[in-house]
Amino acid sequence: MTAPLWPNKNEKNHTVKRALSTDMTSNILSSTNASSNEENSRSSSAANVRSGTGANTLTNGGSTRKRLACTNCRNRRKKCDLGFPCGNCSRLELVCNVNDEDLRKKRYTNKYVKSLESHIAQLETNLKNLVQKIYPDDEQILNRMMVGDVLSALPDSSQVSINYTDQTPSLPIPATRGTFIIENDKVSQPLSSFNQQTEPSTLNSGIFNTQKQNFEESLDDQLLLRRSLTPQGEKKKKPLVKGSLYPEGPVSYKRKHPVKSDSLLPVSSLTAATDPSTFSDGITAGNSVLVNGELKKRISDLKTTVIVRGLNDDNPNSINNDPRILKSLSNFYKWLYPGYFIFVHRESFLYGFFNHSKNNYEDSSYCSVELIYAMCAVGSRLTPDLQEYSEVYYQRSKKTLLQLVFDEQSTARITTVQALFCLAFYELGKGNNQLGWYFSGLAIRVGYDMGFQLDPKVWYVDDNNLQLTQSELEIRSRIYWGCYIADHFICLMLGRTSTLSVSNSTMPESDELPEVNGTEEFRFIGRHVLQISLPLKNLIILSRLVQIFTSKIFIESEDIARKLKYLNTFNSQVYNWRQSLPEFLQWSKTLIENDDVSTDPTISYFWYCYYIVRLTFNKPFIEDSQESETVVIEIIDDLKTLLDNFGKKFGNYTKGNLYQLYSCLLAINCLKKLKEIRSSEQDSWNAQLDFFNHIFYTQLYPAYDLPKKLQEDTELETEQENQMLNQVGNINYTHDFSLSHEIDDLIRELFGVGTPQKL
């Protein structure tokens, strides 16, 4: 039991006074020497007490007044002994913060408060009139600005005179719209509540005290406050940026043309212009162009949009009339869409392709020359007669893209991102993994530059001044999540960590978008209605599982038992994912054997993606895990059925895709391992291996050059291995890991953790 803090209630004040007057200074000085770090963290008011003025009294201009209780005791509603540190803080080991100023008796007169309300009401009236003139039909802007909070509380603001002759010291008027923000936006209090009984300390603290100091300290603070407001009086919306030399937006964003006053008007006012001569030819308003006074049409509603070809084609030799281009694009959308090309939304691209061909597609939001050639480079590979043009299209797109990306004056566009991803898949099909990785990484960098992972309303593009329609917002969402799936698929195939992440995006989910009339030539003729949104959402979930377990299974250096534990967890999670799929996306052995369903590329791509994920994770552990071996054998049987049905349905594999290409490659590698493990079933493995080898090396080539490249690399590796066997006896390899060990020891010493293992 500790002794009571106050032995005698009657002697409490005398004891404190005597103890503080005799021993306070020496005790504080000794405690200062003992713990200097604690003293530095105390408030400036406590420093005044330590100077020897007395713990229970404070001197201010010759007058002596009693010190207040410390902050901790006031918050806990405990009696403070007015010591320093007080008994309660000492017992609880808290920092004793002394309040050196009593604000409870400092009150402002009702006359002064009324004058503030009158002044703000007059400002709100002027602001309301200004907003109604600029935006006559937009009541939402007034609601967002909260104009009228004080004005509505006053019976007649015009009769209240503004008089600041009160004896109360003048205070700066906060630059807020009807709301006081105290500290860091944690507490808000309407101005109209000032005619009620409020705590006077609020008026002399928080925003008043802070802004008074800021306004009096420097003129720069006042200028900064004005610059932070738009001409309409709203606070400027800052984009979500991190520490950067370019905090106001992307690095390369520059408008191509100076913004004129006409381009700042709403779209309705531009289209309603009665005098076409007021607009010069070629004036750009974002990505919509005023040509001879007519605003180029945008996608207002996909449900009512119709693509009519030939209306704006004055030149029969234009790119959208080239039969080779049309056939290549038809192959692209018939056989490869959606798949890993979800990011090239078909309806918006074709709308721009057929309607915005003038000015070389410079004014189209979702179509560009480099994107057309990139898509044609991919689509032309699926027709033997057009394969010779594939490299030509690729070089044209590549040359244009590199000029755009590495030109400081160019503007980041979403079509640039789409084209770079198309070239990445083109290079992967040729077996150039390095170039494919470079192009995909460049696409993501350009996308980040325009903020494509953020809300589609705040993308840094040239159409920021035009209000986007709901369909355009949904198209942008579809493009981003398509890029997300493309990035994760490429990283899965190349064994890299993905770049795009769900946690770093504020993009809303992609909704189902309708098919537009006029795109029949670019659709796969099947018996099922195309659905993209639902499969896309579930692929995002699957990619998230892959992202989580990739680091645990393939990156972190753990023993094989720990990796197998993570692998079993991953297999169970993916199994649960498949079982939880909606009925439309579920499949079984019966559905796989159905020729109409399993050969439909708009449906089977979802299955191939699942199989590729399972094979990629289980292939390295076939020798170590019975579960992995069983999973691989079951998947190989399903893939054999799918590929066999595709060959029987269409007669060949010239219209195959990368999903089929990589699934064949994974199946071949798995079968080679199974031959080593189960030598008793050699005949079965050899038969299946011949099946996949035939499709991979003879059927999918020459549409894809990857099989040929792998065959050449295998022969080259065999020659190099033979040469190394003859030279290995004469080579001494010296590996110096001293720096690595030194860094590991330093990390262990600083953070108290051990490194996974030493090399």
From Swiss-Prot:
Motif window: 9aaTAD: 744-752
InterPro entries linked: Transcr_Regulatory_Elem, Transcription_factor_dom_fun, Zn2-C6_fun-type_DNA-bd_sf, Zn2Cys6_DnaBD
Region (Disordered): 1-61, 229-254
Keywords, ordered alphabetically: Activator, DNA-binding, Metal-binding, Nucleus, Phosphoprotein, Transcription, Transcription regulation, Zinc
DNA bind region: 70-96
Coiled-coil annotated spans: none
GO molecular function: DNA binding; DNA-binding transcription factor activity, RNA polymerase II-specific; sequence-specific DNA binding; zinc ion binding
Role summary: TY1 element enhancer binding protein. Binds to the DNA sequence 5'-TCGGTGGTATTATTCCGA-3'.
PTM-bearing positions, type Phosphothreonine: 22, 755
GO-annotated cellular components: cell cortex of cell tip; nucleus
Signal peptide extent: none
One GO BP annotation of this record: transcription elongation by RNA polymerase II
Record's subcellular location: Nucleus
Protein known as: TY1 enhancer activator
Miscellaneous comment as given in the Swiss-Prot or TrEMBL entry: Present with 736 molecules/cell in log phase SD medium.
Residue ranges, compositional bias (Low complexity): 30-51
